[in-house]
């Protein structure tokens, strides 16, 4: 669930061995290893699952055009998670030119997982002391999360909270909508239930940009309005791309990338129930912003101007209202 990249800055070839522990407590899926690539056009890494993946891919392309729901199937497919979204949608989400969005989908990239960097990477690294201080602060926060045995007894725990109040919003965009979250930090009883919740309100055409749950499965329930939900798996296939309305449920597996957009006629309001009392979310936009410019340029084959556009113009938070220039592309 945590995005990372590796660069060999030495003079010799590097052989790295990765151990994937699918039985760890954070994994809420099955024991099948899955690798989610944000960029490139990677090959299948686990041959034992390739036959199953090909079968799903054939089933997807055998559907009638009218049942596919979105536009991404009309474009050439890649194997990264962003290839499951259409270029038009990515251009709207990241507020970029359509050419940049097409490169993000990496449909014709023949480099697979490994990219050769000409001239080396120029990266600003944080000082070691800063990293140590951050680790100490995280350890302190973890130690303070234990129950104190006094105010956090079962009998005295608060059991109700209204996360739909506008003033309660954790994230807000006056043109796109708002997001409110309830977890064991704001409602401690959720620790015993191992659940958390998220309330999302999207205005007309508002977008909750592509994101994924690092440590939880989620259940999306529409309470008002209508819109579209897109879900992409580890092979870059859109496993769900359809309109949703009041009363409908959608299950989003852990680490699957999902994006929601409200309709043109009315907004979209929904609740998301998550199977972890402190569910963590990663947003593709924030990942791009935190990734060094040279890494993005080499990974996606972007020019410097496009990297700047992607890191700055398209990263104003996970709630987005499509710009007129993106809509006209």
From Swiss-Prot:
The keyword rRNA-binding does not apply. Residues 129-138 have a biased composition (Acidic residues). Residues 47-79, 97-149 are annotated as: Disordered. Signal peptide: none annotated. SMART domains: Cupin_1 (SM00835). One of its GO terms (molecular function) is nutrient reservoir activity. PROSITE patterns: 11S_SEED_STORAGE (PS00305). Residues 161-308 form the Cupin type-1 domain. SUPFAM superfamilies: RmlC-like cupins. Pfam families: Cupin_1. Gene3D superfamilies: Jelly Rolls. Keywords: Disulfide bond, Seed storage protein, Storage protein. Residues 99-112 have a biased composition (Basic and acidic residues). CDD domains: cupin_11S_legumin_C (cd02243). InterPro entries: 11S_seedstore_CS (IPR022379), 11S_seedstore_pln (IPR006044), Cupin_1 (IPR006045), RmlC-like_jellyroll (IPR014710), RmlC_Cupin_sf (IPR011051), Seed_Storage-Functional (IPR050253). Belongs to the 11S seed storage protein (globulins) family. This protein found in the seeds of many leguminous and non-leguminous plants is the source of sulfur-containing amino acids in seed meals. Hexamer; each subunit is composed of an acidic and a basic chain derived from a single precursor and linked by a disulfide bond. This is Legumin type B. It comes from Vicia faba (Broad bean). The gene is LEB6.
